[in-house]
Amino acid sequence: MDLHNDVLLEAAAKRDITVRSSTGHSDLPRLREGGVDVQCFALFVHPKDAGHGFERVMELLDAFDRLAAANHAVLGSATSVAEIARLQQAGRLAAVLAIENGSALGGDVDHLDAVYQRGVRMMSLTWNNSNGLADGAMESRHGGLTPLGRQVLTRMQQLGMIVDVSHLSAKSFWDVLAVTQGPIVATHSNAAALTPHPRNLDDEQLRALARRRGVAGVNFYPTFTGGPALARILDHIAYMIKVMGPDHVALGSDFDGFGGRVSDLEDVAYLPNLTAGLLDRGYDAKTITRILGGNALRVFREIWGR
């Protein structure tokens, strides 16, 4: 299970992700080769599209619907853990839809209900930039969470949507934890202690996620790991387990959200190398199963209720 992949943007831009390609990091055949059976697909609204964010996210949802309709035997949308299990049993990829950047709501809380009806079950408030909901990791404009951001979080929790704190500023992160209850996730964020970067989380933030029964998905982007090598990803997994415990670490590859390649993990088809690396570092099967999906599914079950 991968908590964050951006390939749906490629599909929306008319790249055929139903055929195996050497382009990018992923497509449907390579996801299968890599053993991914649950994929959270990011519906990313770039800041340049913020002025028509709701229209943009609807375009991305339409692109997913076309993909799913044309490939019914291969994948399906999952809005519950029970649906994930049914899709897994059928040998189909379970697709969880997640908005990246709350600018997708166009400043209207009611749009949350609209995207929920379309199958969206997770959302981050910002990307790197600040918006009308909160400050992002790379820009301070509001001093944290805004009143509108609080309204959005309230409605998300009423709907049973998963709150993703990746891309938030530190102040926004703590504000979100103060006004929400239950598990929170950071879908694609690493340990700042190993790789200092505003997009990574410090030890206290990681511990706070663990106290809330949440998870952090380790990001494969070399800028956030400290270098383009599988070993650096394994280092972050090991460190985050040390800080958070083995029940709170997951994977959030960010594949197709960055350029270049990671040695020994060049694309999603090479994910078995990560499993082998965990075995080589002495992790037992139970811990590896948690990292590869068990921890994230536990959070989904607690928030979704089924």
Regions found by a protein language model. Name each.
Residues 75-78, 161-168:
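Catalytic beta/alpha-barrel core
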Residues 108-112, 172-182:
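Distinct, well-ordered alpha-helical segments
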